[in-house]
Amino acid sequence: MDAESIRLNNENLWAWLVRLLSKNPEWLSAKLRSFLPTMDLDCSYEPSNPEVIHRQLNRLFAQGMATWKSFINDLCFELDVPLDMEIPLVSIWGPRDEFSKQLGAGEESCPGPQLYHGAKRPFQSYGSSPRRKNSKKQQLELAKKYLKLLKTSAQQWHGGVCPGAWLTPHSPQTYIPPVLQWSRATAPLDAQEGATLGDPEAADNIDVSIQDLFSFKAHKGPRVTVLLGKAGMGKTTLAYRLRWRWAQGQLDRFQALFLFEFRQLNMITQLPTLPQLLFDLYLMPESEPDAVFQYLKENAQEVLLIFDGLDEALHADSVGTDNAGSALTLFSELCHGNLLPGCWVMTTSRPGKLPSCVPTEAATVHMWGFDGLRVEKYVTCFFSDLLSQELALKEMRTNARLRGMCAIPALCTVTCFCLRRLLPGSSPGQSAALLPTITQLYLQMVETFSPSETLLDTSILGFGKVALRGLDTGKVVFSVEDISPQLMSFGAVHSLLTSFCIHTRPGHEEIGYAFVHLSLQEFFAALYLMASHTVDKDTLVEYVTLNSHWVLRTKGRLGLSDHLPAFLAGLASHTCHMFLCQLAQQDRAWVGSRQAAVIQVLRKLASRKLTGPKMIELYHCVAETQDLELARFTAQSLPSRLSFHNFPLTHADLAALANILEHRDDPIHLDFDGCPLEPHCPEALVGCGQVENLSFKSRKCGDAFAEALCRSLPTMGSLKTLGLTGSRITAQGISHLIQTLPLCSQLEEVSLHDNQLKDPEVLSLVELLPSLPKLQKLDLSRNSFSRSILLSLVKVAITCPTVRKLQVRELDLIFYLSPVTETATQQSGASDVQGKDSLKEGQSRSLQLRLQKCQLRIRDAEALVELFQKSPQLEEVNLSGNHLEDDGCRLVAEAASQLHIAQKLDLSDNGLSQTGVTYVLKAMSTCGTLEDLHISLLNNTVVLTFAQEPREQEGSCKGRAPLISFVSPVTSELSQRSRRIRLTHCGFLAKHTETLCEALRASCQTHNLDHLDLSDNSLGGKGVILLTELLPGLGPLKSLNLSRNGLSMDAVFSLVQCLSSLQWVFHLDVSLESDCIFLRGAGTSRDALEPKFQTGVQVLELSQRYTSRSFCLQECQLEPTSLTFLCATLEKSPGPLEVQLSCKSLSDDSLKILLQCLPQLPQLSLLQLRHTVLSSRSPFLLADIFNLCPRVRKVTLRSLCHAVLHFDSNEEQEGVCCGFPGCSLSQEHMETLCCALSKCNALSQLDLTDNLLGDIGLRCLLECLPQLPISGWLDLSHNNISQEGILYLLETLPSYPNIQEVSVSLSSEQIFRMCFSKKEGAGTSLRLCECSFSPEQVSKLASSLSQAQQLTELWLTKCHLDLPQLTMLLNLVNRPTGLLGLRLEEPWVDSVSLPALMEVCAQASGCLTELSISEIQRKLWLQLEFPHQEGNSDSMALRLAHCDLETEHSHLMIQLVETYARLQQLSLSQVSFNDNDGTSSKLLQNILLSSCELKSFRLTFSQVSTKSLTHLAFGLGHCHHLEELDFSNNSLREEDTELLMGALQGTCRLKKLHLSFLPLGASSLALLIQGLSRMTLLQDLCLSHNQIGDVGTQCLAAILPKLPELRKFDLSHNQIGDVGTQCLAAILPKLPELRKFNLSHNQIGHVGTQCLAAILPKLPELRKFDLSRNQIGDVGTQCLAAILPKLPELRKFDLSGNRIGPAGGVQLVKSLTHFEHLEEIKLGNNALGEPTALELAQRLPPQLRVLCLPSSHLGPEGALGLAQALEQCPHIEEVSLAENNLAGGVPRFSKRLPLLRQIDLEFCKIEDQAARHLAANLTLFPALEKLLLSGNLLGDEVAAELAQVLPQMGQLKKVNLEWNRITARGAQLLAQGLVQGSCVPVIRLWNNPILNDVAQSLQSQEPRLDFSITDQQTL
C-alpha cells in the first residue's frame, strides 16, 4: 500500500492528520528526529506549513509499515486525539495485539527504531528502580529478550538496508569493501600475514574477511582491534556495516553489539557508568537491567563494542568541564579489561599517535580504500543502467587522475555522483577537463544544488561561515542554535547535513547536526575564505599551512583542517576563477589577487626544507592549483634525495609526488623507510622517468605491494637502484619480480634484504643475473634460504661472467657484479680465436668468494675445491667460521696452488689444531705464490695471502719504467717476492721446536722464507736456544719475532751470538720485561711482521734504512759480570754496530766496566743508555771517556737517566761535543768537570743547561774556562743566573778574547749561551733580553761596555731600559776607538716623539754613523763611532746655514748637527709625520741638510702628510751623495708622489731606488722617468705594486737604455699585459748587466712570453727570472723551454701559477739538463701531473737548492721519483710538495742531505704507514729547521717516530702537525721526545682529536705543545 492509495481512500483521515500536526509542530519535529536520525528534514521552513508537514509524513511513511505504525501508536498515546479519529487510525495503521509476543516468538522485524519507541513509558534510568534477585533461568530469559530487542532495534535503525557510501542509498549487496591490511604481530589465524582482506569480485565472501577482523589470537588480555584509515576511507561505513551484518545474523560469534560515535560521546556532561552507557545512552532493557548487565559480564567474550572516531575523542584537558574525557575513560577501562573483561573492542581512527588507553598488544588494521578492481566494482554498482555503467567505466579507464582520486571511497562516491550528471550530455573524455582535481569535483557537486544554474550564493557562503567557525573552534557537531533555519533547510534539501539524537546525560536528549563528511565542512570553509569580503588576504593566507603528520605522533587528537589548505589551493586554480567571481559577486581582479596570494604562499613553502609529511601535503596542494609554473618550481626545488619516514602513504600521495616529478629534469632518489604503504600505491609511479633510486623498507609491504610495483618498474627508464627491504615478500611476490626485472636492463643495484624468500625464490632471482647486464649488486640477505643451495650459488658465481664477488655469512647473501662493458672481451668468428679470447677473459676476470659461518664440513670442502678449480682467477676465498677442522684445512691448503688465488685464502675459525698447523705448513711447500701465512690458534686465525702471478707482476710494472731507474740496488733486491709465516698464539712448547722447524724447512724448500713470527707461544729459554741452533737450516731470513715466549737472560746471550753467526741478522731488539724479541735483516723495520705487505711502488719503503747492525736490550738489570760477558759477545759482531741498553739503574762499577770495554769494540758507532738511572758521579765518568776512548765524538747525559755516545772511526777529526743537561750540577762540580774535559783536544760544544749553577757556579766556570779547549757553543740556560752574573761576565769579558757571541734572556726561557771562536779578535756580540737593570747596574754595564774593546754589537730587548737610562748609557759609554752598534727594543719607542729620540741619540759620546727607527716594531738601532771628532767652526757654520733654526729646538739643532755630521745611513720605518706643527719633519729636514755623508735613506710603512713631505723633499734635494733611497709602502696621495718625484731630480748618484706601493699617475710617472734619465749609475730599481699598466710600461721602457748599469729590475704587481711586455722586450737587450728580473703577478699571456723568449738569450748575466702568477699557459712555457738553455748563468726561475699543464711542463723540464748553475725551481700551482714529475726526477740539477711544487697535481709515483732524484742533490735546502695527493708516495730518503732546512708536505693525504719512513729518517737532515706536515692523516705511529728523532734534531725550529689524527697518546709521546733534549720551540697540534682538558694537561706538562689556534696565530 503506497502513499497515493492512502490519500485516495482516506483523504479525510490524512487531511485531519495534517491539521493535527500543524498544531503540534515541535512534537512532530522531535518524533521525526527520533525515527529518522540520519535523514535530512525540511524542519527549517515553517514547520506549521501544511505542505511541509505533508512532505515529512510522506518520508516517514516511506520508511516502511513498521515505522509508520509505531509513529501512529505514539501519536495516539501522546497527543490529544479524539476518539472518533483514534479508532480509524488504530484500525488502519495501529499495532497488532501480538506485538508484545514478537520478541519471544523470534521474529526478525520490529516496529520502530532502536532507541525512541515507547515514549508513553516514562523514562527510568538504570539504577533508579529497585533491583530484584532473579534466578538463573529468569536472568537468561531477560537477557534473551534484551538481545533480541537489541538486534531488532539495529534492524529497525537500518530500515532493512545497510548504509553505503555517502549521497547514495545502497542495498546490502552493493557495499564494496576497502583494502584492509594487518599490522603488528596479531594476524588472523586463518589468513596469511600482510594479506589484504576482502575480495571485490566476490561480495558474497566478504563476510569471511570481516570475520577475520575478530579471528586473531589475543594473548592474555583484552581483544582490541584498531582500524586506521585516512579521511574518506570508509571507516564509519565499515563500522555500521558490521552492525548491519550482526543484525542480519552474519556475525554469530557475538550475542551483543554496541556502536558508539565519539563525536556524540563527547557531548556527555556527566560521567556515566558502563551500564548507563549501554542502557541509558543506547538501549534500555524492558525490565531488570541488572540481570541483563550481569549476563553481559558473564558472556563478555561474545560482546562487541565499536567506538567510531577515536581521533575525535576529547581528552580531559581538551574542554573545561569536570567530566571531560569521561567517554575516553570508559573506553580505556574497556580496552584494558578493567570493565567487562573479555569483551571485544573495536575502534576506528585516522593515522597518528594512538592514545595511551589503547593497549600496545592491540591488533592494528590499515584501511587503504579502493584499488582498481574495487573502483570498477563500485562504479558498476553505483550506476543502475548498463549504458551509464559503460560510459562511467570508460571515463575511469581513460583518466588516470580520476581513477586515482577514486581510490578514496568518499571521493569515489562524489565522482560517481558528478559523472551521473555529466555523462548523459558530455562527450567521451570530458571528465578529464571537468574533474581534474578534488576541488573541481566538489565544485561540480555544488553546481548540482541549483539545476537552473543560479547559485544560492547567500546559502553557500552562510554554510561556509558555519563550517569555518566549526573548524576554528574544533566543532563537528552543531546544535540548533549554531545553524539558522534557512541554512538547515538548505542542508537538508541537498543532503549536506545529517541529524541525530544526542544523549548528554541519562534522561536528557538533544538534536545534533553535522556535515555528512568532515571534508565537506572543510570545502565550504575554503569557499568562505576565498569568496567572503569579510576575510582579508592576510587572514586568508594564514590558513595556507602544511599539517605535518609528525604532529600526529605527539598530539593526542587530530586537527580538523587536514584538507583545508588543499581546497584553498584548488580554489586558487584558474578554472575556479569565474565561479568565485560569481559567488563573491566581485570583479576578476579582486578574486585574482586572492588566488595569487595563495599561490605565492605555496611557492614560498616549496622553497623551504620540509619534512616528508609536509612535502606530501605540499604536492597535493600544488596539484590542486593546476599551475604549471608552480609545479616546475616545486620540482626543481626538490633535493636530490627525498626521504619519507614513518608515516602512512596512500596511492593519492604517491600520485601527487609523481605529478611533481613530471616537471623535474634532474634525477632523484626516493626513500620510503618505515612508512605504512597502500598495497597498490606503487602504481602511481608508472612512467616516473626521473627516479634513479627507489627504496622501500616496511613490514607492511607484501606480495600485493610487489605485484603493484612490478607494473611500474618497466616504465621507470632511469631507475638504477631498487630496494625492497624489511618487507614480507614471499614466493608469490617474487614470481612477479622475476618476470619484471629482465625488463629493467638499466638496473645497477637490487636489494631484497630482510624478506621471506626461500630456496626456490633465491635461486630464481640468482638465475636472472645474466639478464641484467648493468647490475652491480644483488642483496638477498636475511631471507629464509638454507645451506643446501650454497653450492648452487657458488656455481652461479663461477659461471656468470659478470659476478665478481659472492658474500655469504649466516643470513647475509650478496652478489657483487661488474657490468658487461667492463668485463666482456671482443669475440672473433674463428673457433680457435674464440678459445683464446675466452682464455683471456678467464684470466682477466677475478672473483671473490666469501662463504663464512655456513657450517661447511670436509665433504663440502671437496665439492667446493672441485668447483674452484673450474673457476676463473679467484681474488679471494674466505671459508672462515665453518667446521673444516684439520683434514678440511689441509685439503683446501693443498689445493691452493692450483686454485689461482690472487690475494687471500681465509680458513679461520675452522677448528684447526697444532697438528693441523704442521699439515698446512707442509702443504705450502708446493705453493709458489704464497706471500703470507698467519695462524693463531688462540684467535682462531688461519689466513693465507698470495702474490700475483709473475707474468701479471711484469705487466703491472710496464707503465712505471721511468721510476725503475731510481730504485736502488738494495730496493730492487727487496722488491722480489717475499714469504712471511706467522705462527702466533699456537701454544708451541720447547718440545715442539724440532718438529716445527722440520715443517718450516719443508715449506721453504723451493721458496725462501723471509719473515717468521713465533710470538706469543711458550718456547721458553730452552726452546729459543734450540731454535738458534736450528736457524741456519731455515735459510737467510729477513726477520724473526720471538716475543712473549718466556725468555731468560741466557737465551738473550744466545741470540746475541746470532749477530756474528748469522749473516742475515743485522738488528736484535730485546725487551725482557715486556718479553719482546725481534731479529731483523738489513733494511727491515719492525713492521716487517705486520699483516699488510707493501707491493708495487710501496716496496720502496723497504729501502735500506740502516747500513749498520744494532743491538737493543731494554727493561733488564745488568750486573758487572753480565756486562762483561755481553761486551765480549759483541766483540765478535761485525760493524758498524749500534747498541742501546735500557736498565732500571746502572751502578758506577757497571758503568766503569761498560766504558772500559768500549775500546775493545772498534765497530761500535753508537751507544745509548735510555731510561737508565745513573749516579751523580756518572757525568765525570762520561766526561773522561774522551781520554779513555778517542773515537768518541759526542757524549750527552740528560737528567742522569739518558746517555748517548757517538763514535767516529776517524780519530783525527777535530772537536767533540759534550752535554750534561739536567744533571743537578752545581758550583762544586765545575772544577772536577772542567778538569776531566780539559783532556780533550778540542771541545766544539758543551751543554750544561738545566742545572744548579747560579751566579756562583758561573763564576767558578768562568775561572776554569781557560782550561777548556772550547771553540763552539757553551750553553748555560736554565741555571738561575741573574743580572749580577751577567755583569760579572761583562767585567771579565776582556779576559776571553775568543768569545764571539753571548746571548742571555732572563725571561721564562732562561737562555744563557756563549759562542767561542777559534780565532781571537773576531768581535763580540752581546744580546740581552728581559734583563732589568737598576741605575747602578746601568752604570756598571756602561763601564764594562767601555772596557770590552772586542764588543762590537749590543742588543737590548725588553730590558725595561727607559729613556733616562738610555740617555745615561749612551753618555757613559766611551771608548778610545772603534765602532759600537746598539739595538734597542722597548715598548716606549712607539710613544716617544721623533725629536725626543733624536735628542737622546745626540747625548752619545761617539759620532752617530747609522740610525734606524721603527715605531710600530718598537725598535731603535744606532751605530756609534769612537772617538768623537770635533769639526772646525767653518764647516759647522756651513752645515747650519741650510738649517731652519727658527724653532723651539734650535738649541738642540747645533748639538744634532754635530752628532749627525757623519751619519751615513738613516732608516725610518712605521713612523708618523702627521704632526700639525711639522716639528718632526723639520727636524728630519735639518738632519738631512746637515748630513753631508749620508748615502742611504729609507722611509717605509709610514704616514706622511703633504706638509711633512715638503720638508723631506727639500732635505733630500740637498743629499747629493745619496746612493740608496727606499720610499716604499707609505701612505701618499697622487700630488704627494709628484712632490717626491721632483725631489729625485738631483739624486744622480743613486744606485738603489725602491718605490713600491706608490700611486704613480701619469704626471708622477713622467717626473719619475725624468729623474731616472739622470740616474745613470742605478743598479737596483723596484717599482712593484704601482699599477703602471701597459701604457706606463711603454713610457718607462723608453728611458731604460739610459740605465746601462741596471742589475735588478722589479715590475711585479703592475697589471702589465702582452702589450707592455712587448715594449719591455724591445728594450731589454740594452741592459746587458741585468741579473734579476721580476714580472710576477701581472697579466702576461703566451704572446708576451714569446716576445720575452726571443730576447732573453741576449741577457747573458741573467740569474733570476720570476714570471709567476701570470697566464703564459703551455704555449708560453714551451717557448721559454726552447730558450732557457741559452741562459748559462740562470740560477733561479719561478713560473708558479701560470696554468701550465703536462704538455708545457714536460717540455720545460727537459731543458733543465743544460743548466750548470740552476739552484731554484718553482713551478707550483700548475697542473703539471705525474708525467712532468717523472721527467723532472730524471733531470734535476745536482746543484739544486730549492724545489717548490705545491698544488701541482702530483701523485705517489712522481713524489717517490723526485725524492730519489733529490738524493743526488747534496745542496738541497728546501723541498715543497704541499697540496698534492701523495697518499703512499711520501718521499723516502736514504742518503744524508746535510743542508736541507725545510720540508713542506702539508695537505697531501699522507697516512701513518707512508710517513713513518720519512719520520724515522729525519736524522739524515741535520740542518732541518722546518717540518710542515699539517692537514694530513697522520696518527700516533708517526708521532712515536718523531718523538724518537726529536732529541737528535739540533736545528729544528718548527714542526706543524695540525689538522691530523694524532690522539692524546701521540701527543704524550711527542712531549716525551721534547723532554729528552729537543730544542724545538713549538710543535703545533691544534685540530687533532684531543679533548680540551687533556690538551690543557699536556700543555701544562710541556708548554712547547701548542693546541690553540689563537696562540698559534700570535707566534
From Swiss-Prot:
Keywords on record: ATP-binding, Cytoplasm, Immunity, Innate immunity, Leucine-rich repeat, Nucleotide-binding, Repeat
Tissues in which the protein is found: Expressed in spleen, thymus and lung.
Stimuli inducing this protein: By interferon gamma. By LPS and viruses (at protein level).
Subcellular localization, as worded in the UniProt entry: Cytoplasm
ATP-binding found in the keyword field: yes
Limits of the NACHT domain: 223-542
Binding-site positions, ATP: G229, K230, A231, G232, M233, G234, K235, T236
Domain of life: Eukaryota
Primary localization class, coarse: cytoplasm
GO biological process: defense response to virus; innate immune response; negative regulation of NF-kappaB transcription factor activity; negative regulation of type I interferon-mediated signaling pathway; positive regulation of MHC class I biosynthetic process; positive regulation of transcription by RNA polymerase II; positive regulation of type I interferon-mediated signaling pathway; positive regulation of type II interferon-mediated signaling pathway
GO molecular function list: ATP binding; RNA polymerase II cis-regulatory region sequence-specific DNA binding
LRR repeats: 622-646, 716-740, 744-771, 772-796, 871-898, 900-923, 930-953, 1006-1033, 1034-1055, 1138-1161, 1162-1184, 1240-1263, 1265-1292, 1348-1371, 1481-1504, 1519-1542, 1552-1575, 1576-1598, 1603-1626, 1631-1654, 1659-1682, 1687-1711, 1715-1738, 1741-1768, 1769-1795, 1821-1845, 1849-1872
SUPFAM superfamilies, per the entry: P-loop containing nucleoside triphosphate hydrolases, RNI-like
Protein family: Belongs to the NLRP family.
Function: Probable regulator of the NF-kappa-B and type I interferon signaling pathways. May also regulate the type II interferon signaling pathway. Plays a role in homeostatic control of innate immunity and in antiviral defense mechanisms.
Binding partners and assembly: Interacts with CHUK and IKBKB; prevents CHUK and IKBKB phosphorylation and inhibits their kinase activity. Interacts with RIGI and IFIH1; blocks the interaction of MAVS to RIGI.
UniProt name for this protein: Protein NLRC5
UniProt gene name: Nlrc5
